Amino acid sequence: NLYYAPDPSSQIACSIGGNVAENAGGVHCLKYGLTVHNLLKIEVQTLDGEALTLGSDALDSPGFDLLALFTGSEGMLGVTTEVTVKLLPKQPVARVLLASFDSVEKAGLAVGNIIANGIIPGGLEMMDNLSIRAAEDFIHAGYPVDAEAILLCELDGVESDVQEDCERVN
């Protein structure tokens, strides 16, 4: 099972060309990178009509990184016409931890503490109370609406590593 790691919040309506133009990320970008980190090659049409191939089928290519320059240029350098992406193997285990906080500041400090302890979550999202209530009104996920902030921390990998990381985060 392979998958494309970037998962922008607009994924239900966005296109891969738009992801390249904006260098889209999503909640998994901390561990798996932005669009630019998950591209091998793109074909573009420059503003003067020249067709270019940037990048290669290999993970690394010599010379200037024109692929990175073009990615995120919001169409100012040209239009993406074809994209070759890097696919990753799906992790065998993924668990999501929910932590609630009485302040946004404490939630932010928790993010720093998680990373400072060498844990790189597969996904990490913080929501303030306004966002919690809006999401809860819409999807009824069971978020604590009295919390000032929550963290959703997704830990992924092999079972033993995920279990250890869950214990360390708790």
Model regions: which residues?
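Noncatalytic alpha-helical scaffold of FAD-dependent oxidoreductases
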Residues: N1-N170
